[in-house]
Amino acid sequence: MARIAGVDLPRGKRVDIALTYIYGIGRATALQILDATGVNWTRNVDDLNADEVNEIRKEIEQNHKVEGDLRREISANIKRLMDIGCYRGLRHRRGLPVRGQRTHTNARTRKGPRRGTVGKKK
């Protein structure tokens, strides 16, 4: 089983699909990586030899930010927004939509479950 960036790639899948199991690599990036390394994207992970796996691993390490590094960078960016006190940072801090969506109705995913109103029972 090929292990790249701390992720075990699934054995029976095509290489381009298997690379998307790595956080930060989608289909387009996977195809770019395979073009750069010269590996045919229609091959299965089982069919790759050690040299090809090492080429892919080297390409990802040198030119792409994936897994832990990418997660750390994203959380640092959000923390920076919260620290400087900008509008986007305040929205992150309050757990509300950041990009201008309406919140009078909708936005339930971001706001969490509804709090029931405590009212007079008839």
Swiss-Prot record:
| Chain spans, region Disordered | 95-122
> Is Cell cycle there in the keyword field?
no
List the Gene Ontology MF annotations in alphabetical order: rRNA binding; structural constituent of ribosome; tRNA binding
Q: Which UniProt keywords apply?
A: Ribonucleoprotein, Ribosomal protein, RNA-binding, rRNA-binding, tRNA-binding
Q: Which InterPro entries match?
A: Rbsml_uS13_C, Ribosomal_uS13, Ribosomal_uS13-like_H2TH, Ribosomal_uS13_bac-type, Ribosomal_uS13_CS
- Biological process (GO), any one: translation
One GO cellular component, as annotated: cytosol
Functional description taken from the UniProt entry = Located at the top of the head of the 30S subunit, it contacts several helices of the 16S rRNA. In the 70S ribosome it contacts the 23S rRNA (bridge B1a) and protein L5 of the 50S subunit (bridge B1b), connecting the 2 subunits; these bridges are implicated in subunit movement. Contacts the tRNAs in the A and P-sites.
Q: Which PANTHER family match?
A: 30S RIBOSOMAL PROTEIN S13/40S RIBOSOMAL PROTEIN S18, SMALL RIBOSOMAL SUBUNIT PROTEIN US13M
Complex and partners? Part of the 30S ribosomal subunit. Forms a loose heterodimer with protein S19. Forms two bridges to the 50S subunit in the 70S ribosome.
Family (UniProt):
Belongs to the universal ribosomal protein uS13 family.
This one is known as Small ribosomal subunit protein uS13
Report the source organism: Nitratidesulfovibrio vulgaris (strain ATCC 29579 / DSM 644 / CCUG 34227 / NCIMB 8303 / VKM B-1760 / Hildenborough)
Tell me the gene name: rpsM
